[in-house]
UniProtKB/Swiss-Prot annotation:
GO terms for biological process: cell division; cell wall organization; peptidoglycan biosynthetic process; regulation of cell shape; UDP-N-acetylgalactosamine biosynthetic process. The modification 2-(S-cysteinyl)pyruvic acid O-phosphothioketal is found at C115. Changing C115S: Loss of activity, but not of substrate binding. It holds the Pfam family EPSP_synthase. GO terms for cellular component: cytoplasm. Phosphoenolpyruvate binds at K22, N23. The lineage of its organism: Bacteria, Pseudomonadati, Pseudomonadota, Gammaproteobacteria, Enterobacterales. It is found in: Cytoplasm. It comes from Enterobacter cloacae subsp. cloacae (strain ATCC 13047 / DSM 30054 / NBRC 13535 / NCTC 10005 / WDCM 00083 / NCDC 279-56). GO terms for molecular function: UDP-N-acetylglucosamine 1-carboxyvinyltransferase activity. This is UDP-N-acetylglucosamine 1-carboxyvinyltransferase.
Amino acid sequence: MDKFRVQGPTRLQGEVTISGAKNAALPILFAALLAEEPVEIQNVPKLKDIDTTMKLLTQLGTKVERNGSVWIDASNVNNFSAPYDLVKTMRASIWALGPLVARFGQGQVSLPGGCAIGARPVDLHIFGLEKLGAEIKLEEGYVKASVNGRLKGAHIVMDKVSVGATVTIMSAATLAEGTTIIENAAREPEIVDTANFLVALGAKISGQGTDRITIEGVERLGGGVYRVLPDRIETGTFLVAAAISGGKIVCRNAQPDTLDAVLAKLREAGADIETGEDWISLDMHGKRPKAVTVRTAPHPAFPTDMQAQFTLLNLVAEGTGVITETIFENRFMHVPELIRMGAHAEIESNTVICHGVEKLSGAQVMATDLRASASLVLAGCIAEGTTVVDRIYHIDRGYERIEDKLRALGANIERVKGE
């Protein structure tokens, strides 16, 4: 397995170009199964999960090409089963189910894998598809969906806010007969982006970005060209990298209005922040950040995917900060690793109390999930001495060329190839 070796401490400064959002590109790639004509998707990041998705789409009979953009032609889909060997590494595969049953009347997906951070049941996806008239069976480790004729529009009230299930229901409902209303829908920018992609293909969707999305079913979706929005979590990660190292950064190809909660907390921590239409700059003027209190919650509140990075910020800040995680259980696996580097923290159920220290020391640490592993790499950039981060395949699932981008900001980081 590959590792990162990071030599610190360094002040990170310079410019970074933000990649397309993984969490929008994935649902958009799966939603392309609904289109009867070719689709061009621009600004798709080069990531392990994207490669897996492209393989999965190919296995379903879709023509997939990548040359700058990703080109998808789903006009000849002839296999309606997403097998375990591809699904096991990536839970996003469940997003194949809605489009398959909506367009072809049948689909089956092996129960998914992915990061091990708490319960992420597929129940809400199943609940939504059943409301639209699909018959669902769980057999031999597969979720199997079928319908005679077309799905039927429905008024669906979600028990809890779920990004994944909102995507499934919204994409399936585009080809359903009649109108579907999703109440308590997720409001994330990536949901809006997926909806806008579907609209570009001819879907009739309104209310995306609010908690009530309305979809008027159409008979078919055509082709089109669409550009994936910038990755707000990658943007936030690099802003934190500059903030914890006293540095100065400009993030290009960013979308500031998707990061309001994060920018507010960075300002509270003492950062000078300016924004333009597609850029964000942060300047710490060489100062240590001040500790902040953070509570994760569904968008537009503070994102759970930025929690690990802000835990690190608090651990090297002036003062004591409290971080409360309300979205996933079991999402403080980075904290014991940071304690090995000299951090002072206590975990109490879903809260971590961070007592800022002036410096961290390099150590051998292990990545446990995608965002936690990014925080360990950033910790290595500011710690004294050498840090080795093991199991970085987690990082490769969500960050495009993170070591190249950090190196351009002055980090001393190298990838050590595993056996």
